[in-house]
Amino acid sequence: MFACDELLLNASTIDATGLQLSNQAIVIRKGRIEWCGSEDQLPAHFQESAKSRKDCHGQLITPGLIDCHTHLVYAGHRAAEFRLKLQGVSYADIAKSGGGILSTVQMTRDASEEELIEQSLPRLLALKNEGVTTVEIKSGYGLDLQNELKMLRVARQLGEMAGVRVKTTFLGAHAVGPEFKGNSQAYVDFLCNEMLPAAKNMDLADAVDVFCESIAFSIRQAEQIFQTAKDLNLPIKCHAEQLSNMGASSLAARYGALSCDHLEFLDENGALNMVKANAVAVLLPGAFYFLKEKQKPPVDLLRQVGVGMAIATDSNPGSSPTTSLLLMMSMASQFFSMSIPEVLSAVTYQASRALGMEKDIGSIEVGKIADLVLWSIKDSAALCYYFAYPLPHQTMVAGEWVS
């Protein structure tokens, strides 16, 4: 029998559905979970051979949290626009005066890679401080070849610097590049012919996303991008049905999407197509709150048809300027009436599915990477009850305690 590196005893844990289990033990060897289950069934040789033991005193251990939808890499901020919004100035007027997403695009283009790292790293570290061990980071504030690739390179570097697993998503189809104003189709053609192949060839993109909406890209344009991604063997995601029902979720499902995100205006047909594709619904309560939206995502429908629900921060300067996944968990339970187990699964197992990583992370199961968080609480409901609190007692990444 092999000796194990770490033995965690007397713990409360959660399963993949978010249900809490008591009197649990976890055996860790070579960065992965060697055994887990009820402590009274723990094989004796693990007790005898463990190099290190930790009595958790009944405290909660969860998988490392996963933020599966962020726009963490950008320069500057839009606090001045927020002041104008509070004074009643419309988004259209703000955009006409040079604000909105294109202001972030300009600041991001003007920033060097070093400056982007300096501004973005604290955001990633703030997530890590909450027990987040895996983060998805999208591009989408470059909107040209040079700057989209720059954003993806920075995202990769941030993961290495912070000790957080980062998955990158190419979101060149976030808005039309300013050089192509009035000719969105020419921009889409350039994206498909030049930008996306370059991101693939440089191994900078793990997935491809499209903002499919009347103010962004049409169904036909989204399909062109999805087909290009498919040809490049890149999985897809979609900003879908956020402001209206365009059928983007059904289109994305047809291309085997990992996830469809936002979904406030999702209908039954779209939900059923997501079930067929095994796509995850990524709900973003931060954007719902910050934009003062009235239409909630159809959580009851998603439950009824069996679509898995994930939660993410959508961290970005325009519609969700937050770096707290814990706060999103509280918001999801309050705004969207999600149960405690649903919320816990949404930031662990379902979030791993949204990234196509469920075989390696997202749940406490034998063979998976030992990304774990030990909390100074015994009741899992506390993670949703408090606002952005408590912080982890300790976090483990791939079998090593990092905090």
Curated annotation (Swiss-Prot):
Residues engaged in binding N-formimidoyl-L-glutamate: Y141, N316, G318
Enzyme Commission number(s) of this protein: 3.5.2.7
Pfam families (UniProt xref): Amidohydro_1
BP term (GO), one: L-histidine catabolic process to glutamate and formamide
Binding site for Fe(3+): H69, H71, H239, D314
Keywords: Cytoplasm, Histidine metabolism, Hydrolase, Iron, Metal-binding, Zinc
Superkingdom: Bacteria
Residues the record lists as binding Zn(2+): H69, H71, H239, D314
CDD domains: Imidazolone-5PH (cd01296)
Protein's UniProt keywords contain Cytoplasm: yes
Localization: Cytoplasm
Necessary cofactors: Zn(2+); Fe(3+)
EC class name: hydrolase
InterPro entries recorded: Amidohydro-rel (IPR006680), HutI (IPR005920), Metal-dep_hydrolase_composite (IPR011059), Metal_Hydrolase (IPR032466)
Co-factor remark: Binds 1 zinc or iron ion per subunit.
Subcellular location, principal: cytoplasm
Residue positions binding 4-imidazolone-5-propanoate: R78, Y141, H174, Q242, S319
Stored PANTHER family: IMIDAZOLONEPROPIONASE, IMIDAZOLONEPROPIONASE-RELATED
General function of this protein: Catalyzes the hydrolytic cleavage of the carbon-nitrogen bond in imidazolone-5-propanoate to yield N-formimidoyl-L-glutamate. It is the third step in the universal histidine degradation pathway.
Protein name as catalogued: Imidazolonepropionase
Originating species: Legionella pneumophila subsp. pneumophila (strain Philadelphia 1 / ATCC 33152 / DSM 7513)
